[in-house]
Amino acid sequence: MMSPIYFAYQLLLSKRMPVMLLALLLGQYSIAQTDSVFKMTKEHGHFFCQTTLNGVNAKVMMETGVPGLMMSEAFYEAHKDSLKLDVKESDEKIRHITGFRHVKYTAQARMQIGDAIFEGPVHILQEDQAITLPLHMLHHPSDSSAIIWLDLSRLQFRVCSRDRLQNLTRKASVWSLTYTQYGMPVVTTPLSIKAAGHRIDITGQFIVDLGNASLLFLNRYDAEVDKLMSDSRVHLIDIHDNRRGKTYSQAFRVDKLTICDRTYHDDTVGVTTFKGLEGCGMLGLKFFTMPVVFDFDENKLYLCK
């Protein structure tokens, strides 16, 4: 089969293709050759991809709000010979918004995830658990860069090399990232909310949680957020976990919300009292209406136009 580069070269010689179009095609070919590409599906507000973990076929959920790669004990036991994890028994509990997860084994691992490299902690849980993949622990195979290009509208993310960053982030706004004690990315930003005649304004730290299907969760465990919520007197409704028969959070409707200089209208904001959650809340998937680039090496978040 004729290679794309040779085919484009022949077209240029025959003067059948404008130079700019040729450059575009070669650029797209270069991207395909250098990026580790993951195609996603959307299910119940979350994003999944079909990939491999050390050669084992697996359906994984995209995340940034977890402290490592997480999988069920059943999946691990079925594939442990291929996964090749050096596990240690654990009695750790991981706090989740709907309750605790019980950790059976832990490991520190470097694994092949599709064409990319995962490096970080692995938690093997007793409960039935979707495999959750923390994007901030993925690295490009050629230079180990932790750069993620994400476009939810195209159902795709890419693990990119360092030399791709400048082209990916032209005209993007830039936000600095810090990290929680568990390594989850955090952005510091002003937040302004208008809801039913009330107004909430705060500048604070928000965990970037790609496992959170909402636009935003506010954390009333933070004293400043709690005071603002009490003073604003917005009407809160309970959100139930039907499987456990418990109320795990609340929510309220907003007329207008601005965060990271991006504005959203007529949406819902969740409210939780999540003991131990750092910062003012969690920024979720519905925020990402634009392509974004995470540079986890240089601690930058780029919001593309």
Provide a role label for each language-model segment.
Residues 1-36:
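Bacterial Sec-dependent N-terminal signal peptides
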